[in-house]
Protein backbone atom coordinates (compact mmCIF):
# COMPACT_ATOMS: atom_id res chain seq x y z
CA UNK A 1 0.00 0.00 0.00
CA UNK A 2 1.15 3.54 -0.75
CA UNK A 3 2.57 5.47 2.18
CA UNK A 4 1.74 9.17 2.51
CA UNK A 5 3.27 11.35 5.22
CA UNK A 6 1.96 14.86 5.94
CA UNK A 7 3.67 17.35 8.25
CA UNK A 8 2.48 20.64 9.68
CA UNK A 9 5.25 23.25 9.45
CA UNK A 10 5.07 25.95 12.15
CA UNK A 11 5.62 24.47 15.59
CA UNK A 12 5.88 20.90 14.28
CA UNK A 13 8.92 21.07 12.00
CA UNK A 14 10.01 24.45 13.42
CA UNK A 15 10.63 25.71 16.94
CA UNK A 16 8.26 28.67 16.48
CA UNK A 17 5.82 30.37 14.13
CA UNK A 18 7.56 31.75 11.04
CA UNK A 19 5.22 34.62 10.07
CA UNK A 20 6.65 37.15 12.52
CA UNK A 21 10.20 35.97 11.84
CA UNK A 22 9.66 36.41 8.11
CA UNK A 23 8.16 39.89 8.49
CA UNK A 24 11.13 40.95 10.61
CA UNK A 25 13.58 39.46 8.08
CA UNK A 26 11.92 41.01 5.03
CA UNK A 27 10.88 44.41 6.44
CA UNK A 28 13.18 45.07 9.38
CA UNK A 29 12.54 45.26 13.10
CA UNK A 30 11.23 48.83 13.30
CA UNK A 31 8.90 48.51 10.32
CA UNK A 32 7.58 45.29 11.87
CA UNK A 33 6.94 46.94 15.24
CA UNK A 34 5.25 49.94 13.61
CA UNK A 35 3.10 47.67 11.46
CA UNK A 36 1.98 45.65 14.47
CA UNK A 37 1.22 48.86 16.38
CA UNK A 38 -1.00 50.10 13.54
CA UNK A 39 -2.66 46.68 13.35
CA UNK A 40 -3.15 46.28 17.10
CA UNK A 41 -6.91 47.06 17.24
CA UNK A 42 -7.96 44.10 15.11
CA UNK A 43 -5.17 41.88 16.48
CA UNK A 44 -6.70 42.43 19.93
CA UNK A 45 -10.15 41.61 18.52
CA UNK A 46 -8.72 38.42 17.01
CA UNK A 47 -7.19 37.40 20.35
CA UNK A 48 -10.59 37.99 21.96
CA UNK A 49 -12.14 35.73 19.28
CA UNK A 50 -14.18 38.66 17.95
CA UNK A 51 -12.42 38.82 14.57
CA UNK A 52 -11.59 35.82 12.33
CA UNK A 53 -7.99 34.63 12.43
CA UNK A 54 -7.71 34.32 8.66
CA UNK A 55 -8.91 37.91 8.12
CA UNK A 56 -6.43 39.24 10.65
CA UNK A 57 -3.63 37.29 8.99
CA UNK A 58 -4.57 38.59 5.54
CA UNK A 59 -4.78 42.21 6.74
CA UNK A 60 -1.38 41.90 8.39
CA UNK A 61 0.08 40.35 5.25
CA UNK A 62 -1.43 43.08 3.07
CA UNK A 63 0.01 45.81 5.30
CA UNK A 64 3.56 44.51 4.94
CA UNK A 65 3.61 42.98 1.46
CA UNK A 66 0.76 44.40 -0.61
CA UNK A 67 2.25 45.93 -3.76
CA UNK A 68 5.56 44.07 -3.57
CA UNK A 69 6.92 42.71 -6.84
CA UNK A 70 6.54 38.94 -6.90
CA UNK A 71 10.23 38.48 -7.76
CA UNK A 72 11.28 40.60 -4.78
CA UNK A 73 8.99 38.63 -2.46
CA UNK A 74 10.27 35.26 -3.72
CA UNK A 75 13.88 36.40 -3.30
CA UNK A 76 13.14 37.44 0.30
CA UNK A 77 11.52 34.04 0.92
CA UNK A 78 14.56 32.15 -0.38
CA UNK A 79 16.92 34.32 1.64
CA UNK A 80 14.80 33.80 4.76
CA UNK A 81 14.95 30.02 4.39
CA UNK A 82 18.72 30.09 3.84
CA UNK A 83 19.40 32.27 6.87
CA UNK A 84 16.88 30.73 9.29
CA UNK A 85 17.51 27.01 9.09
CA UNK A 86 18.10 27.12 12.84
CA UNK A 87 14.31 27.33 13.18
CA UNK A 88 13.95 23.72 12.01
CA UNK A 89 13.64 20.83 14.44
CA UNK A 90 16.31 18.31 13.50
CA UNK A 91 14.30 15.32 14.71
CA UNK A 92 11.43 16.36 12.48
CA UNK A 93 13.74 16.85 9.49
CA UNK A 94 15.19 13.38 10.06
CA UNK A 95 11.70 11.84 10.08
CA UNK A 96 10.80 13.69 6.89
CA UNK A 97 14.04 12.63 5.21
CA UNK A 98 13.53 9.02 6.29
CA UNK A 99 10.04 8.97 4.77
CA UNK A 100 11.35 10.35 1.47
CA UNK A 101 14.27 7.90 1.41
CA UNK A 102 11.92 4.96 1.98
CA UNK A 103 9.80 6.00 -0.99
CA UNK A 104 6.83 7.57 0.78
CA UNK A 105 4.93 10.49 -0.73
CA UNK A 106 5.47 13.48 1.56
CA UNK A 107 3.70 16.83 1.91
CA UNK A 108 4.10 19.87 4.13
CA UNK A 109 0.58 21.13 4.93
CA UNK A 110 0.81 24.61 6.41
CA UNK A 111 -1.17 27.77 7.06
CA UNK A 112 2.05 29.67 6.29
CA UNK A 113 2.68 31.11 2.84
CA UNK A 114 4.07 28.40 0.59
CA UNK A 115 6.60 30.82 -0.97
CA UNK A 116 8.71 30.84 2.19
CA UNK A 117 7.95 27.28 3.34
CA UNK A 118 9.10 25.52 0.16
CA UNK A 119 12.71 26.82 0.11
CA UNK A 120 13.36 25.21 3.50
CA UNK A 121 13.06 21.85 1.76
CA UNK A 122 15.02 22.47 -1.44
CA UNK A 123 17.60 20.08 -0.04
CA UNK A 124 16.58 17.38 2.40
CA UNK A 125 19.57 15.51 3.84
CA UNK A 126 20.04 12.03 2.42
CA UNK A 127 17.61 12.34 -0.49
CA UNK A 128 17.25 14.07 -3.84
CA UNK A 129 13.45 14.19 -3.53
CA UNK A 130 11.43 17.09 -2.21
CA UNK A 131 8.13 17.15 -0.35
CA UNK A 132 5.07 18.75 -1.90
CA UNK A 133 4.20 22.02 -0.14
CA UNK A 134 0.50 22.71 0.45
CA UNK A 135 0.46 26.17 1.98
CA UNK A 136 -1.59 29.34 1.81
CA UNK A 137 -1.04 30.91 -1.61
CA UNK A 138 -0.72 34.61 -2.31
CA UNK A 139 -2.67 36.41 -5.01
CA UNK A 140 -0.68 38.30 -7.65
CA UNK A 141 -1.67 40.66 -10.43
CA UNK A 142 0.66 41.98 -13.11
CA UNK A 143 3.66 40.61 -11.25
CA UNK A 144 2.79 42.20 -7.91
CA UNK A 145 1.28 40.91 -4.70
CA UNK A 146 -2.25 42.22 -4.13
CA UNK A 147 -2.02 41.57 -0.39
CA UNK A 148 -4.83 39.02 -0.60
CA UNK A 149 -4.66 35.24 -0.48
CA UNK A 150 -5.47 33.19 -3.58
CA UNK A 151 -6.60 30.22 -1.48
CA UNK A 152 -8.37 29.85 1.86
CA UNK A 153 -6.04 29.91 4.85
CA UNK A 154 -4.67 26.35 5.04
CA UNK A 155 -5.90 25.68 8.57
CA UNK A 156 -8.22 23.13 10.18
CA UNK A 157 -10.65 21.53 7.68
CA UNK A 158 -8.85 23.26 4.79
CA UNK A 159 -5.80 21.09 5.49
CA UNK A 160 -7.88 17.96 4.90
CA UNK A 161 -9.39 19.43 1.74
CA UNK A 162 -5.93 20.19 0.35
CA UNK A 163 -4.69 16.69 1.21
CA UNK A 164 -7.69 15.14 -0.57
CA UNK A 165 -7.01 17.33 -3.59
CA UNK A 166 -3.43 16.09 -3.98
CA UNK A 167 -3.92 12.57 -2.61
CA UNK A 168 -7.36 11.31 -3.69
CA UNK A 169 -8.47 7.66 -3.47
CA UNK A 170 -8.17 7.66 0.31
CA UNK A 171 -8.65 3.89 0.59
CA UNK A 172 -5.52 3.25 -1.47
CA UNK A 173 -2.89 4.67 0.88
CA UNK A 174 -1.86 4.73 4.52
CA UNK A 175 -1.72 8.28 5.88
CA UNK A 176 0.62 9.35 8.69
CA UNK A 177 0.26 12.92 9.99
CA UNK A 178 2.27 15.13 12.34
CA UNK A 179 0.91 18.30 13.95
CA UNK A 180 1.09 20.46 17.06
CA UNK A 181 -1.95 22.73 17.32
CA UNK A 182 -5.71 23.18 17.05
CA UNK A 183 -5.26 23.92 13.36
CA UNK A 184 -4.00 20.36 12.83
CA UNK A 185 -6.84 18.53 14.61
CA UNK A 186 -8.83 17.64 11.51
CA UNK A 187 -5.69 16.49 9.69
CA UNK A 188 -4.64 14.28 12.60
CA UNK A 189 -8.15 12.82 12.86
CA UNK A 190 -8.20 12.13 9.11
CA UNK A 191 -4.93 10.17 9.26
CA UNK A 192 -4.52 6.46 9.95
CA UNK A 193 -1.77 7.45 12.39
CA UNK A 194 -1.64 10.93 13.88
CA UNK A 195 1.19 12.26 16.04
CA UNK A 196 0.68 15.36 18.20
CA UNK A 197 3.79 17.38 19.15
CA UNK A 198 6.03 14.43 18.21
CA UNK A 199 9.40 16.17 17.96
CA UNK A 200 9.57 17.94 21.34
List where the protein language model places each region.
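Active-site neighborhood of HAD-like aspartate-dependent phosphohydrolases
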Residues: 1-49
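Helix-loop "lid/cap" segments that line or gate small-molecule binding pockets
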Residues: 44-49, 56-65
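N-terminal short leaders/motifs
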Residues: 47-53, 133-136
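C-terminal cap/substrate-recognition subdomain and adjoining C-terminal extension
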Residues: 1-4, 75-76, 82-200
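Short histidine/acidic/glycine/proline-rich micro-motifs that form metal-
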Residues: 47, 81-82
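Low-complexity, intrinsically disordered basic tails/loops
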Residues: 58, 71-74
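N-terminal, charged amphipathic alpha-helical interaction modules
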Residues: 63-64, 73-77
Amino acid sequence: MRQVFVFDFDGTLTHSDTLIAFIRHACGRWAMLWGFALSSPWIVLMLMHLYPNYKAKQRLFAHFFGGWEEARFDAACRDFARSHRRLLRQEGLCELGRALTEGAEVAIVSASIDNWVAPFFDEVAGTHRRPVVLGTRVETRDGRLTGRFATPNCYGPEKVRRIREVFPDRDNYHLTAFGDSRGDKEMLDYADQGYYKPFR
